[in-house]
Curated annotation (Swiss-Prot):
Catalyzes the phosphorylation of N-acetyl-D-glucosamine (GlcNAc) derived from cell-wall degradation, yielding GlcNAc-6-P. The gene is nagK. This is N-acetyl-D-glucosamine kinase. The lineage of its organism: Bacteria, Pseudomonadati, Pseudomonadota, Gammaproteobacteria, Enterobacterales. Its EC number is 2.7.1.59. PROSITE patterns: ROK. Zn(2+) binds at H157, C177, C179, C184. GO terms for molecular function: ATP binding; N-acetylglucosamine kinase activity; zinc ion binding. It catalyses: N-acetyl-D-glucosamine + ATP = N-acetyl-D-glucosamine 6-phosphate + ADP + H(+). The keyword Lipid metabolism does not apply. One of its GO terms (biological process) is N-acetylglucosamine metabolic process. ATP binds at residues 4-11, 133-140. The keyword Kinase applies.
Length: 304
């Protein structure tokens, strides 16, 4: 059996999967935010409860909203203060007496999609989460790419390409990102960036769902804005597609539910790519909120 944990700032979800990726048991509990020992104890109790439910000792994979840094495996994550700087993987492995694997939750999202029955034949899968920020990951031949520092897939912290300024104006503010840098693309093309950019251009703060509703209703400002936003999205994604040349691009997060993206984006991307480049297949994520636990379980299952 394969246990996948999705650890968030408010909840921890555990999903237990068999070898065919059928979910056979699950449980959700509040996250102990500030006490590391309490968090460890809760995770250990959940693992033992799952063992009792399925009658075997399952393997443990964990997706976290952060980065596992260095060879010692310390976590860097603002959303889980109890784990900041702690070697969670090492501590859990020792206490459970089994191999525990940890990866960024965006990597788990992409891994889950790459192992979907429909998508499994694609060698290179690029995933992007267009949510509050811009997360992502890369899976090659069924395995996630983490990189030396665990930051592969932190695409949101790439800078705006120069041609983006032709689309949204050279006077666009260089927003200071949470990482401390200026001009990171997640501040412009994430779900939050979608709303911020509309407010900057039109002086009116509206939620994304309202902007999209106005767009579908033919409202002039919304039509103009979405046209510019799609060009901006294509300019930013064009760099990623040229860099990784994926067979499949999967989109998740709240903005991925804007279904017109899947019709418009393929018409805007070709001008941002090399003339010989063929577009990847572009799809909405298949597994939604369940992708985190599924991908975490796959951190072990992909070995088989």
């Amino acid at each position: 059996m394969y246990y996948g944990f999705d650890m968030g700032g408010t909840k921890i979800e555990l999903g237990v999967f068999d070898a065919e990726l059928n979910k056979v048991w699950q449980k959700r509990v509040p996250t102990p935010r500030n006490n590391y020992d309490d968090l460890l104890a809760m995770l250990i109790d959940l693992v033992h409860e799952a063992d009792a439910q399925v009658g075997v000792q399952g393997s443990v994979g964990i997706g976290v909203p952060g980065i596992q840094t260095g060879d010692e495996g310390a976590l860097f994550t603002a959303n889980l203060p109890a784990t900041m700087g702690k070697p969670l993987r090492i501590d859990l492995s020792q206490r459970l007496q089994r191999d525990v694997r940890i990866s960024n939750d965006a990597n788990c999202f992409v891994l889950s999609e790459a192992w979907d029955a429909e998508f499994r034949s694609y060698p290179v899968v690029l995933g992007l989460i267009l949510g509050t920020g811009l997360g992502g990951g890369l899976v090659i031949n069924g395995r996630p790419v983490d990189g030396r520092n665990g930051i592969a897939g932190e695409f949101g912290h790439l800078r705006l390409p120069s041609d983006a300024l032709d689309i949204i104006g050279v006077d666009i503010p260089r927003v200071k990102c949470g990482c401390g840098q200026f001009g990171c693309i997640e501040n412009y093309i994430s779900g939050r960036g979608f709303e911020w950019l509309y407010e900057h251009l039109y002086g009116e703060a509206l939620p994304a769902v309202t902007i999209i509703r106005h767009y579908r209703g033919g409202e002039e400002k919304a039509l103009e804005f979405v046209d510019r936003f799609m060009d901006l999205l294509a300019a930013c994604l064009g760099n990623l597609l040229t860099l990784f040349d994926p067979h499949l691009l999967v989109l998740g997060g709240g903005l991925s539910n804007f279904d017109e993206i899947y019709q418009i984006l393929p018409t805007r991307l070709p001008s941002r790519l090399l003339p010989i480049a063929k577009l990847p297949r572009i799809e909405k994520a298949r597994h939604g909120d369940a992708g985190g636990v599924r991908g975490a379980a796959l951190l072990h299952l992909m070995d088989n």
